[in-house]
Amino acid sequence: LRGIIGHEIGHVKLGHSMSQMRTAYMASAGRKAAASSRGVGGALAASELGELGEALINSQFSQSQETSSDDYGLAFMKKHGYNVKAMESAFRKLAAASGGKKGGTMDNMLSTHPDPGARADRMRDMANK
């Protein structure tokens, strides 16, 4: 629980809400500007492919924020002398709760959160440093 609290504090301290909103607005504005142009580029931007591109930008940015908040949470645990292995354990439980299923490449790319198993592995590696 302490690791999750540290993770969530990380979102606040790292300004993720504002930067996520800014990225979403910029991606949307960019796609709409491209869609308003003539030719193949405009047609692609206005199509479902353009929507997919926008979703990809937003989800990858979100995954990056989740990773940096994981790092913040682990540093929080270390700083306060808490068991750093607890974060790995939490992500292993999350992976098990999802049936241990790994999504396909596209599912993983469009997810707002990194794969919990990969997050657990990363936390294990960082805790051992």
Where are these regions (language model features)?
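A Zn2+-metalloprotease active-site environment signal
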Residues: 1-129
